[in-house]
Each structure stands twice: as structure tokens, then as C-alpha cells.
Amino acid sequence: FLGALVNALTRVL
């Protein structure tokens, strides 16, 4: 779960 959340944030950056 956490990994997916961080992945989404990284995509935005």
C-alpha cells in the first residue's frame, strides 16, 4: 500500500 502511494507521488513529481 505505502509503496503504491509513494509511486503515485513520484509520478506527479
Curated annotation (Swiss-Prot):
- Cellular compartments per GO CC: extracellular region
Q: In which tissues is it expressed?
A: Expressed by the skin glands.
The signal peptide, as residue positions, is none
Biological process according to GO = defense response to bacterium; innate immune response
Record flagged with keyword Secreted? yes
Q: Where in the cell is it found?
A: Secreted
Q: Does the keyword Disulfide bond apply?
A: no
- Carrying Leucine amide, the residues are 13
Q: Which UniProt keywords apply?
A: Amidation, Amphibian defense peptide, Antibiotic, Antimicrobial, Immunity, Innate immunity, Secreted
The UniProt entry lists the main location of this chain as secreted
Annotated family: Belongs to the frog skin active peptide (FSAP) family. Temporin subfamily.
Function summary: Antimicrobial peptide.
Name of this chain's protein: Temporin-1Tt
